[in-house]
A protein has these predicted regions:
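N-terminal subdomain of nucleotide-sugar transferases
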Residues: 1-71, 94-96
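Active-site proximal beta-strand in glycosyltransferases
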Residues: 8, 35, 100-102, 115-133, ...
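Short, flexible loop segments at the rims of nucleotide/cofactor-binding pockets, characterized by
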Residues: 11-13, 75-82, 135-141
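Alpha-helical structural signal in soluble globular domains
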Residues: 24-28, 117-121, 156
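Conserved beta-strand edge residues that scaffold enzyme active sites
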Residues: 40, 107, 132-133
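An amphipathic, basic-hydrophobic alpha-helix
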Residues: 63-103, 108-120, 144-152
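Nucleotide-sugar donor phosphate/pyrophosphate-binding loop at the beta->alpha transition
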Residues: 124-126, 132-156, 161-163
Length: 165
């Protein structure tokens, strides 16, 4: 019997449309999944800044898979480049002897810190994000910066995961 792949997934917070995917992955016999959330604000009613309305999910967002909410400093109710200021992932990666770190996104400080820590520990790193390279026209300076940014990202990542089919 093949050993299970020990997969750690780092994501900002429980996301409604990801819950079925995470339950499905957790049901795979060859995968041992643990999800690490940087915040739990979406488990309660919260004001969505993009919609300007309160959101409260009526489905379980964390049922059916192993998960942990990382400790954080300061406010955890919003997501930005610096927030939530979560910590403790490195210790958890070491303790559980993971094989792979899957990171949802690449545009927050904890994404980069997690990827660097995983590479130092010899883990494979996978990235899945909801971004596209099709966007508004950019000036040459911004285009150049993005080109270098993604070259650097590729050095830290072993594979990119697509969203959709």
């Amino acid at each position: 019997m093949e050993p299970k792949i020990r997969l750690a997934y780092l994501v900002t917070h429980p996301i409604q449309y990801q819950a079925p995917l995470l339950r499905r992955i957790a049901s795979e016999p060859g995968i041992d999944l643990t999800v690490f959330f940087c915040s739990d604000f979406s488990l309660r009613s919260y004001l969505d800044p993009d919609f300007g309305k309160p959101i409260a999910w009526d489905i379980p967002l964390t049922g059916g898979y192993r998960h942990e909410i990382l400790p954080a400093l300061g406010r955890r109710d919003r997501v930005s480049f610096w927030r939530p200021f979560s910590y403790g992932l490195a210790r958890r990666l070491n303790r559980a002897n993971f094989d792979v770190l899957w990171v949802h996104g690449y545009n927050r400080w904890f994404h980069w810190r997690a990827m660097a820590g995983a590479k130092i520990r010899g883990l494979k790193v996978l990235v899945r994000d909801e971004a596209t390279n099709i966007s508004a026209p950019r000036n040459r300076l911004k285009q150049s910066f993005k080109r270098w940014f993604f070259l650097g990202l590729r050095q830290c990542v072993d594979g990119f995961l697509a969203i959709g089919t």
